Amino acid sequence: MTLTDCQLLSIVAQLGTFAAAAERMHITPSAVSHAVSGVEAECGFPLFTRTKSGVTLTAAAEKLMPAIQQMLASSESLDQSIAQINGMHKGALRLGVFNSACVTWLPKIVPGFRAEFPGIDVQIYQGSYDDITGWLKTGAVELGFLSNSSAQELDFEPLYDDRLICIAPPDYKPRRPGVVRAEELRGQPFVSQQSDVDADIQSYFKKNDLHVSSQCYIVDDQSMIAMVACGQGLALMPELMFKEGAASAGCQVLQLEPAAKRSIGLAGLSRGALSPAAKEFVKHAREFARMR
């Protein structure tokens, strides 16, 4: 299997259709289909399950993907190292990011990074903690913004401690102004996110033996804030997201007792094996976090 074959299979697996892969690679869908069939013949087994809506990896192909992604990453790192020796910075950096980091950090980090290294193509993939962890393990992304609670099996560099807060409707009355104790949350209606999105919140509930009742299950932070503001319940969320995106959202902001925080950072499979582009991005993110 050649490097070009690996690139083709990775793109098809990522995009899910031959047509989308063809557009990305500037070739025809029939050329993609023919190339994939050729690789399948070489391997001796199918790599994709074909349906009317697209293609998905077979179980056998899923076993190959980590090695394929490792080959692509090694090739990319080699190209970047050669360029660096020649006094240039070029290549691609694939970055996984969760919602609040995408909203609050990337707009302040990426433009400066691109200005300093215009030859590096920064590719951003937004997803949940579980998505990013999976992408890192398969090599789909090289770096990922994560919290410490979701990066236990990865090489994680903490950058910023972000407090968790409780947001409440305007008419909610805590026992002590500005503060809500964990036991006060029992029996209250909650606006919640999916468990793979709010792992830090779920950890707080578990540590404080809280079994909350939720009627609203929300995907993104801004929708959660809107639901709380209109009286649908309380919510726990990172302070960073509220400060940056919802200062006038009409919610009360309450400090938690006991207090809790999440540690935001960058994760990868191995810090020592990062490409030159990834190492430079880590430096930029580290400096940005230090100045906050």
Question: What do the predicted segments below correspond to?
Answer:
Residues 90-152, 218:
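Central regulatory/effector-binding core of bacterial HTH transcription factors
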Residues 174, 188-209, 274-278, 282, ...:
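Secondary-structure junction motif
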Residues 11-28:
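Short helix-boundary/capping micro-motifs
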Residues 153-190:
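Flexible hinge/capping segments at coil-to-helix
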Residues 40-57:
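A short LG(V/I)-centered, amphipathic sequence patch enriched
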Residues 42-43, 64-86:
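Alpha-helical linker/hinge and terminal dimerization helices associated
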Residues 105, 252-292:
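A late-sequence structural motif
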Residues 128-133, 137-140, 147, 196-252:
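Hydrophobic hinge/microswitch elements
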